[in-house]
Curated annotation (Swiss-Prot):
GO terms for cellular component: cytoplasm. Belongs to the IMPACT family. InterPro entries: EFG_III/V, Impact, Impact_N, Impact_N_sf, Impact_YigZ-like, Ribosomal_Su5_D2-typ_SF, UPF0029_Impact_C, UPF0029_Impact_CS. This is IMPACT family member YigZ.
Length: 204
């Protein structure tokens, strides 16, 4: 994906169902480790809750390698899975949902739990504000000092930026560009430098 929506700010929704209190929290989490860290922070904040059920889409919305969920002691399939289904249906990436349940003494049944956990995430998603994320690819570029201002201007025109500059006899730049803008920037760079400058891919 060239770009996707991510949460712009955290959301918390509180709901009481048959004396059980459900607190649904959504947050931006860039990667699985960030998702796990958010879950742990919620656990620390609500240590006395009976359940801390979890779902995350930790990468791009279509990245199945970064999905996760946990029922945390609720009957299998009644919490994490319906929560994840709501997240996946939203089209938002880099997002984690935690639903904290304080048990009120009345059993909700399988259908009731699915509705409570999935419904909590659905309500929170309706309140969520998002922003668009465009991932950038990094390249190196070597130029003369007098060319630097021109290159900065070209990067600005193509939604790119300079990540790092190393000043020696020449300037070695590490730049980042959206994938969709690389060809345009390369063409402008060739025109600007009369073919003397080119982007070099960074080898992993």
């Amino acid at each position: 994906m060239e770009s996707w929506l991510i949460p712009a700010a955290p959301v918390t929704v509180v709901e009481e169902i048959k004396k059980s209190r459900f607190i649904t929290m959504l947050a931006h989490t860039d990667g699985v480790e960030a998702a796990k860290a958010f879950v742990e922070s919620v656990r620390a904040e609500h240590p006395d809750a009976r359940h801390h059920c979890v779902a995350w889409v930790a990468g791009a919305p279509d990245d199945s390698q970064q999905l996760g969920f946990s029922d945390d002691g609720e009957p299998a399939g009644t919490a994490g899975k319906p929560m994840l289904a709501q997240l996946m249906g939203s089209g938002v990436g880099e997002i984690t949902a935690v639903v904290v349940r304080y048990y009120g003494g009345i059993l909700l049944g399988t259908g009731g739990l699915v509705k409570a956990y999935g419904g909590g995430v659905n309500q929170a998603l309706r309140q969520l504000t998002t922003q668009r994320k465009t991932p950038l690819t990094e390249y190196t570029l070597q130029c003369e000092y007098h060319q630097l201002t021109g290159i900065e201007a070209l990067l600005g025109q193509c939604d790119g930026k300079i990540i790092n500059s190393d000043y020696q006899a020449f300037v070695l730049l590490r730049v980042a560009l959206p994938a969709a803008k690389v060809a345009e920037f390369s063409a402008k760079l060739a025109d600007f430098s009369r073919g003397s400058l080119q982007l070099l891919a960074i080898e992993e």
